[in-house]
Amino acid sequence: MRTTTRRLPPAPAAAAVLLAALTCLLLRPAAVAAAGGHAADRIVRLPGQPEVDFDMYSGYITVDEAAGRSLFYLLQEAPEEAQPAPLVLWLNGGPGCSSVAYGASEELGAFRVMPRGAGLVLNEYRWNKVANVLFLDSPAGVGFSYTNTSSDIYTSGDNRTAHDSYAFLAAWFERFPHYKYREFYVAGESYAGHYVPELSQLVHRSGNPVINLKGFMVGNGLIDDYHDYVGTFEFWWNHGIVSDDTYRRLKDACLHDSFIHPSPACDAATDVATAEQGNIDMYSLYTPVCNISSSSSSSSLSRRRTRGRYPWLTGSYDPCTERYSTAYYNRRDVQTALHANVTGAMNYTWTNCSDTINTHWHDAPRSMLPIYRELIAAGLRIWVFSGDTDAVVPLTATRYSIGALGLATTTSWYPWYDDLQEVGGWSQVYKGLTLVSVRGAGHEVPLHRPRQALILFQQFLQGKPMPGRTTNVTVA
């Protein structure tokens, strides 16, 4: 990874992804074992898991029989007293990063992974308190998802990812028929700023009544390459992390480039910017980087990612959470409990992200704005949120992109308040879209501001604006 403008978020050192593809023929029994219905996918207990009052399921759904592509999912249901709760599909980006690794394990999921992968602790602000949350590793080759066609790893792109994700949903609802017609939402962050609206468009156009799509939500996501570049470079300059000369050079070289496939001139400009920025966490400007040595590779030592806040580190910040999930998901007993790598044939290290998929990404449309316009007109609930300390897809980028839609404002920019009557961020309501910022959060909002993120999620599900100062707020 040479620049912060391409990976969202950056992958760890490249896993032996080709080995993954070559061993997938041996892994395929995972899909077969889960084919008998959702009861076969029930997780009895994860290693090191505390007692819980909700059920979990995980397994494989085959999305392309001919190619042998199977996607891995993890479902964390809401407690019985909260049912029937909505179903929410969560997607992380990259492209090439695992929703199980990030969304489920260090953001909004039910658990946080302990140091050295020793076990799990319950996340007080887990989103499955109010919804049934479905995490999907996509495309094939990410996390535990796999393909029997090795070339798939080198030919992934937006279009196939969206269609495979739709095929996953159609089959998943057959395995879990009690979720048919349930209120359904798609949510995600980062490069899922593409995945979420693209999949939502497919679901909407399908007219499939089983998938009762009500809306989508995107956090710190790529929306429109031109406006995202403008807002990102402005944020860098305003925060003093690039020089005047580099700011001008970035604008000259990059503004009309693809965010995912930049030109050599843009690459060169972002290399200069990266050198000027130094060893900081661009995904959360004011938090520390992980300084634990690693045997994986030198590139993993300089990863700049947001990290987690943990119950045993009250008030402090742990910048090394990725190391913990890597250790945990490489445990054979964990894989067995998850119904992953059923045959034990996986002879490569599970990683949070795939460098190979990321660096060989194919089609990546430069703008999601046409999809936004289509789905706004269709009446879907659409929310966009942004942590205001993210320097990769910063709030300024999101505001420029949303501004390009030209929507009428129904409620002007105002501070919203959390349950402690502290300013949680700011919001503006447009005709057909709600924009929310989260104060002090980075690229992964539920990671740095978990309590405020849960309030945001609750308001989204209820279709209510972010609370003002006089509004009584209850956190689930």
Swiss-Prot record:
EC number(s) from the headed UniProt entry: 3.4.16.6
Subcellular location: Secreted
List of glycosylated residues: 148, 159, 291, 341, 347, 352, 472
InterPro entries: AB_hydrolase_fold, Peptidase_S10, Ser_caboxypep_his_AS, Ser_caboxypep_ser_AS
Active site: 190, 390, 443
Statement: the UniProt record of this protein carries the keyword GTP-binding: no
Stretch forming the signal peptide: 1-34
Enzyme class per UniProt: hydrolase
Gene Ontology BP term (one): proteolysis
Family annotation (Gene3D superfamilies): 3.40.50.11320, 6.10.250.940, alpha/beta hydrolase (3.40.50.1820)
Pfam families membership: Peptidase_S10 (PF00450)
Sequence similarity: Belongs to the peptidase S10 family.
Protein name, per record: Serine carboxypeptidase 2
Organism: Hordeum vulgare (Barley)
